[in-house]
């Protein structure tokens, strides 16, 4: 319903790995409410959306909001993987990088790959 493009598994893994690293040196928002606020306020650099969210309405607004605010976003297969990547013990439907810390180059590279998928 809300998945607008396919993301190869290796790119998902790269994105989750980046999210784990950013958690150490930068700033991450966890959960749909915090992610939505970060996008609306123009703070989000990259948004992660889990593909297995039920009910899908929880995150269905995020792709449109990201496109409206010109924020790149990526899908990951599992909310469990996303929860682990942001360092919480429970599943996470969505997350956002708001400060990439020392990983600007890695984030820029990933965002370029994502733009290639969206065409």
UniProtKB/Swiss-Prot annotation:
Gene Ontology cellular-component terms listed: cytoplasm; ribonucleoprotein complex; ribosome
Subcellular location: Cytoplasm
Record SUPFAM superfamilies: L30e-like
Keywords: Cytoplasm, Ribonucleoprotein, Ribosomal protein, RNA-binding, rRNA-binding, tRNA processing
Family under the similarity heading: Belongs to the eukaryotic ribosomal protein eL8 family.
Keyword RNA-binding: yes
Annotated PANTHER family: RIBOSOMAL PROTEIN L7AE FAMILY MEMBER (PTHR23105)
GO biological process, one term: translation
Description of how the protein assembles with itself and partners: Part of the 50S ribosomal subunit. Probably part of the RNase P complex.
Signal sequence annotation: none
Biological role: Multifunctional RNA-binding protein that recognizes the K-turn motif in ribosomal RNA, the RNA component of RNase P, box H/ACA, box C/D and box C'/D' sRNAs.
Main location: cytoplasm
GO MF terms, alphabetically ordered: ribonuclease P activity; rRNA binding; structural constituent of ribosome
Transmembrane segments: none
Protein name: Large ribosomal subunit protein eL8
Pfam family, one: Ribosomal_L7Ae
């Amino acid at each position: 319903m809300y998945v607008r493009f396919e993301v190869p598994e290796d790119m998902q893994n790269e994105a989750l790995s980046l999210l784990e690293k950013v958690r150490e040196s930068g700033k991450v928002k966890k959960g749909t409410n915090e992610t939505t606020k970060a996008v609306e306020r123009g703070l989000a650099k990259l948004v992660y959306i889990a593909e297995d969210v039920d009910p899908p309405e929880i995150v269905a607004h995020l792709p449109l909001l990201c496109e409206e605010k010109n924020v790149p976003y990526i899908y990951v297969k599992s909310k469990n993987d996303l929860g682990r990547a942001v360092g919480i013990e429970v599943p996470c439907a969505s997350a956002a990088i708001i400060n990439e810390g020392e990983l600007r180059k890695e984030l820029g590279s990933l965002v370029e790959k994502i733009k290639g998928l969206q065409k």
